[in-house]
Swiss-Prot record:
Catalyzes the conversion of GTP to 2,5-diamino-6-ribosylamino-4(3H)-pyrimidinone 5'-phosphate (DARP), formate and pyrophosphate. This is GTP cyclohydrolase-2. It catalyses: GTP + 4 H2O = 2,5-diamino-6-hydroxy-4-(5-phosphoribosylamino)-pyrimidine + formate + 2 phosphate + 3 H(+). The gene is ribA. Binds 1 zinc ion per subunit. The active site is at residues 128, 130. The keyword Nucleotide-binding applies. GO terms for molecular function: GTP binding; GTP cyclohydrolase II activity; zinc ion binding. Disulfide bonds: none annotated. It is an enzyme of class 3 (hydrolase). It comes from Pasteurella multocida (strain Pm70).
Length: 219
């Protein structure tokens, strides 16, 4: 497969500030990824605050409480804005790489009692089908080598390091836990090794789209 290429960019005003949106595309498959860039990030010796955020239509756009994705997206952009410089790679691997319709099929199995890993396996997929190596290529195309990575996922860190990206710090991103996703977060911690911190008061649930507060389940 040919390497991904940087193909276009434009200004993108957001509630977190004026970002540049940079488009990337594989020349053979036309599969697309994007990055949101704030400030000067290219070819500097200073580590850049960055987030690899995998696409989640239900969490990012439809305000789902079944995961923490939408909360992580907003929190990452807010932290980058506060820092005044940084990058968010929007990694277009919906449903941990199984696609939107299969993710809904997995949700249906979860409604019947399976956890997020069991549901993927029952559908014939691995627990995580995502390819993070492309994100290392995107960092390189953006002129970024040293990264402070906003993540709870050790696999992202390992993949970036193996690809030659210097991860100088892991920045925790524990936000959005609620009664609908606490078991999901537990599963990611126990079965996937994610660094999950439950029910921290410094990370209160922010749910401006809910008609009432969604209480955090007590442990």
């Amino acid at each position: 497969m040919a390497k991904i290429q940087r193909v276009t960019e434009a200004n993108l005003p957001t509630e977190f500030g004026m970002f540049r949106i940079v488009g990337f595309e594989f020349p053979d498959t036309k599969k697309e990824h994007v990055a949101l860039v704030l400030g000067e990030v290219e070819n500097t010796d200073e580590p850049i605050l960055a987030r690899i955020h995998s696409e989640c239509l239900t969490g990012d756009a439809l305000y789902s409480l079944k995961c923490d994705c939408g909360f992580q997206l907003a929190a990452a952009l807010r932290q980058i804005s506060q820092e005044g410089r940084g990058v968010l790679i929007y990694h277009r691997e919906e449903g941990r790489g199984i696609g939107l319709i299969n993710k809904i099929r997995a949700y249906s199995l979860q409604d019947k009692g399976m956890d997020t890993i069991e549901a993927n396996l029952a559908l014939g997929f691995a627990a995580d089908e995502r390819n993070f190596e492309v994100c290392a290529d995107i960092f390189a195309l953006l002129g970024i080598n040293k990264v402070r990575l906003l993540t709870n996922n050790p696999n992202k860190i390992d993949t970036m390091k193996k690809a030659g990206i210097n991860i100088v710090e892991r920045v925790a991103l524990n936000v959005g836990e609620n009664r609908y996703n606490t078991e999901y977060l537990d599963t990611k911690a126990k079965k996937m090794g994610h660094f999950i911190i439950h029910n921290q008061q410094k990370y209160p649930l922010e749910c401006p789209y809910c008609s009432e507060e969604v209480p955090v389940q007590e442990k």
